A protein has these predicted regions:
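A membrane-topology feature that recognizes alpha-helical transmembrane segments
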Residues: 1-164
């Protein structure tokens, strides 16, 4: 993997709780909070400055801007929610350029697993464990925070284990 194990290990304890929070709130309320996105961004801005070479740090910050602009366009087109776009932008700097192909495969697998699990639980008695979740009522929308948060968390875990 292109991400260094050291960077992944430093990011992981701060980022993983946010990923879990985003997955939970998106399933429960169908929204990703601005606070979660801002904290995720702040963690990278603060830790990344010490963990990455300065030129890499700046390129990764640029990826945040690029993903945010693309996300805004996709949101305006009705393809994705605003919270999803903001979270993807805040998550972008954590991803090493050399890991993009791996990330896409990881995201697709996570998205399929999240969709199958969420839809499967929706139609089983397990739904009674959280009967008030808004995502159960949605027919056309899916809580992408479940897949996005899981993808970033798994990526950092894999980076900590197998990073360069």
């Amino acid at each position: 993997m292109a991400i260094s194990a050291t960077a992944a290990l430093w990011f992981l304890p701060f980022v993983l709780p946010i990923c879990l929070y985003v997955a939970f709130t998106d399933m429960k309320q169908m929204r990703i909070t601005n606070q979660a996105v801002l904290v995720l961004t702040a963690i990278f801005v603060l830790l990344g400055l010490f963990l990455l070479p300065f030129d890499t740090y700046l390129w990764r910050l640029l990826s945040l801007v690029v993903v945010l602009v693309v996300g805004i366009v996709l949101n305006a087109a009705g393809v994705m929610g605003a919270g999803d776009a903001k979270f993807a932008a805040a998550a972008a700097p954590y991803i090493a350029w050399g890991d993009l192909r791996l990330l896409m495969v990881l995201f697709m697998a996570t998205l399929l697993a999240a969709a199958a699990t969420h839809r499967g639980v929706k139609y089983t008695p397990l739904r009674r464990l959280a009967p008030d979740w808004q995502s159960w009522q949605e027919t056309k929308k899916f809580p992408m925070g479940l897949a996005l948060g899981t993808t970033l968390g798994l990526y950092l875990i894999l980076g900590a284990l197998f990073g360069g």
